[in-house]
Design a protein with these regions (language model features):
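Short, well-structured N-terminal submotif of metal-dependent ribonuclease cores
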Residues: 1-39, 46-60, 66, 84, ...
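Acidic, PIN/NYN-like endoribonuclease modules and their adjacent C-terminal/linker elements
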Residues: 1-3, 9, 17-20, 44, ...
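A generic structural signal for well-ordered alpha-helical segments
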Residues: 30, 61-62, 102, 134
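General small-molecule cofactor/ligand-binding pocket signal
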Residues: 38, 69, 140-142
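Residues at the C-termini of beta-strands that transition into short coil/loop
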Residues: 41, 72, 145
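Acidic-residue sensor for enzyme active/binding pockets
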Residues: 44-46, 95
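Short, structured coil segments at secondary-structure junctions
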Residues: 64-65, 137
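Active-site neighborhoods of divalent-metal-dependent phosphate/nucleic-acid chemistry enzymes
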Residues: 68-126, 148
């Protein structure tokens, strides 16, 4: 079964007019057991400040079709490389942690609605260049709309 890393924006997308349809279709695939939703402890922390409906949606993920992963020192080191090599600025470090987490845990696709710092062809090239030079595999990064 495919494993998709969901960054925090995907959970909020379920309640955003622009992103709702594609996001809910993606969560339906999780519910039906077609996709494993991988999320990190960073996502959990970021969701603490989310609206109640987003938190409830996150907590209702089917446990059998979701996988919680931990941010490690290896992940933080890789995320730091993305910043020091100017793929994005320091203020986007948490986005880099999501990218590095998905890379280290070898998910099939990282899914995000963050078009500025994550789902951006130039940024993706930068992340993957660093991944390959650091002996990791390249990472497929897509919006929910692109994978339905």
């Amino acid at each position: 079964m495919q494993r998709f890393y969901f960054d925090t924006s995907v959970f909020g997308g379920a309640f955003d007019n622009e992103f709702e349809e594609a996001t809910l279709q993606l969560f339906e695939r999780v519910k039906l057991g077609k996709v494993i939703c991988v999320f990190s402890d960073l996502s959990e922390t970021e969701l603490l400040n989310a609206p109640e409906n987003v938190i409830k949606h996150f907590k209702n993920l089917p446990k059998e079709n979701s996988e919680r992963v931990l941010v490690t020192d290896e992940i933080l080191t890789l995320a730091t490389k993305y910043v020091t090599e100017n793929v994005v600025g320091k203020t986007s470090f948490d986005d880099c942690v999501h990218i590095a987490t998905a890379t280290i845990y070898k998910v099939d696709i990282l899914v995000s609605w963050n078009f500025k710092h994550i789902v951006n062809v130039y940024r993706i090239r930068g992340y993957n260049s660093i991944n390959i030079r650091s002996n990791y595999q390249s990472l497929e990064i897509r919006s929910p709309k692109e994978i339905l």
